[in-house]
Amino acid sequence: MVFKKIKTQIDHALKQLNLPTDVEYLIQQTKNIQFGDFSSNVAMVLSKRQNKNPQEIAKQIIEQLNPNEFEKITFSKPGFINFFLSNQDKLVVLKRLQETNYSVEKLPKEEQESINIEFVSANPTGFLHLGHVRNAYTGDVLSNILRAVGHNVTKEYWINDLGNQVSLFALSTIIRYLQELGINKYELPDDSYHGKEPIFVAEEMIKDFGNKYQDIKIEDNKIVDSKIANELTQYCTNKMLHFIKQDLESIGVKMDVWTSEKVVYQSNTLTELLNNQLKDHIYEQDGAVWLRTTDGGDDKDRVIIKENKQPTYYGTDIANHYLKHKRGFDRLINVWGADHFGHILRTAYAAELTGIKKGKFVVVLIEMVKLLKDNKEIKFSKRLGNAISIPDMLEFLSKDASRWFMLNQSWTSGIRIDVDLTNKKDSSNPVYYVQYAHARIHKLLTKAEHIDLNKVNLSLLNSDVERTMVNYLASFEHYVHNVATTYEVNKLLNFVYTLTQSFHSWYNSHEILNQKDEIKQTRLLLAKAIKNLINYLLSLFGIEAVEQM
């Protein structure tokens, strides 16, 4: 609202002065409230282009701005134009945030996109671990934010159910199943799955089938009967997906679509691409089909079809992205682990070859997570004996805490979470601190009567901390829309935490209920706006805005 108003005023002034309108300039809260509520560096940006004094340009722009739209407009060195909000501006901001079910202003229809965001997508051969949790939270929250600004978003899980790994997992499970039945004539191959996951699925097999498969034959590390092999491989995949879905739901993540790599392969989409869009970019060598990815900047060409005529993961992934494009998605976002960095260039190149516009294939890379207790890393799962699983994680920290601490830093940074800190009930724990602010205001509003807007006098919100909080309230829509473009979700958490700090400072130093009615009503209006904003922003992150603590 306020950002749009300031930008409209500046852009109009630039046109009136015949100054360039294609410049990228900033509008932001002032660091020192004495200089104004918001400022712009437009004069400094233009001074470099026009080779003029920024003070002279700023003066010209200010003369073209409508002074009636703001309390006042000033200049400060080296070239900032400062805007002081009018009481009417503040009232508009605070009144909008009186609505409990508040939502941000949507993008114009022509800017709204259909977006597919694929995340987690772990192989159905093991349980999810900490790295997957951060990936899941990033995808889930990005989806919430993109939907909030008006995009149509589909959350998708790409099931890697094709190839040798799922077959090996099924073989491992069958051998464990036989062992559970007391049949020990088969040993696990060295390259199979020796963890506890096959045992979990084997126990499910006994519940579902009893001893039905006790006579199954295995030769050369393969189930002899191909029909039974296919049935049990699918069974094992489905069981692991069931466990994965359960774990995701336990942390508040629910996918819209689950897409099978096997189904994509069986659709012959990759063959169609090889015969059409990719035909001028492939060649055969050593019995395999290669895509000339070096033309797109890759360090070497990549195999799409192996010598045994089976597709590589890269090949089916190309087909998968093409099918998403055909389904009508304008933007394809992938949340990957940082170890997939090398896949970006070649996948983006293939996406362009198949008709996906440049810039519409997007990758967010997630770094790893470590849990610390007593300053020591928690490395092993009680349940699995290896990586920390989701049930393990939830024994150490709550869903709300895990969401906050996995999202409050840039996704390019590795995270070390001190589980002792996450369980503290004081200001050192940011989750508690923010939730406490919400609960504090809820209690305050419960004690107060309804807010009478006729008795509100916004000129009474004149302390630095009050003006700063109003400015945060006026800024947050801009932050949400910005994150929908940059995907830097951590900046929204930092925003709500900083707002909360200001609130606690204000609450501790300003009396609210025991005041003259005009002051009380005005401060209650501000407090309720802050409460509703905290509630809204926490909802985007899937964190509960508690009312009692």
Curated annotation (Swiss-Prot):
Q: Name the InterPro entries on file.
A: aa-tRNA-synth_I_CS, Arg-tRNA-ligase, Arg-tRNA-synth_N, Arg-tRNA-synth_N_sf, ArgRS_core, DALR_anticod-bd, Rossmann-like_a/b/a_fold, tRNAsynth_Ia_anticodon-bd
Q: Among its keywords, does the record have Repeat?
A: no
Check the record and name the CDD domains matching this protein. ArgRS_core
Write out the entry's keywords from A to Z.
Answer: Aminoacyl-tRNA synthetase, ATP-binding, Cytoplasm, Ligase, Nucleotide-binding, Protein biosynthesis
- Tell me a Gene Ontology molecular-function term this record carries: arginine-tRNA ligase activity
Q: Write down the Gene3D superfamilies for this protein, in alphabetical order.
A: Arginyl tRNA synthetase N-terminal domain (3.30.1360.70), HUPs (3.40.50.620), Isoleucyl-tRNA Synthetase, Domain 1 (1.10.730.10)
EC id:
6.1.1.19
Where in the cell does this protein reside?
A: Cytoplasm
Tell me which SUPFAM superfamilies the record gives: Anticodon-binding domain of a subclass of class I aminoacyl-tRNA synthetases, Arginyl-tRNA synthetase (ArgRS), N-terminal 'additional' domain, Nucleotidylyl transferase
Question: Quick one: where is this thing mainly located?
Answer: cytoplasm
Q: Which GO terms describe its cellular component?
A: cytoplasm
Catalytic activity annotated for this protein?
A: tRNA(Arg) + L-arginine + ATP = L-arginyl-tRNA(Arg) + AMP + diphosphate
Does the record bear Transcription regulation in its keywords?
Answer: no
Motif 'HIGH' region mapped to chain? 122-132
Record's superkingdom? Bacteria
Sections of the chain in a coiled coil: none
Q: Which GO terms describe its biological process?
A: arginyl-tRNA aminoacylation
What does the subunit section of this Swiss-Prot or TrEMBL entry state? Monomer.
Which PANTHER family does the protein's record reference?
A: ARGININE--TRNA LIGASE, CYTOPLASMIC, ARGINYL-TRNA SYNTHETASE
Name the family the entry cites: Belongs to the class-I aminoacyl-tRNA synthetase family.
This protein's name: Arginine--tRNA ligase
Q: What organism, scientifically named, is this protein from?
A: Mycoplasmoides gallisepticum (strain R(low / passage 15 / clone 2))
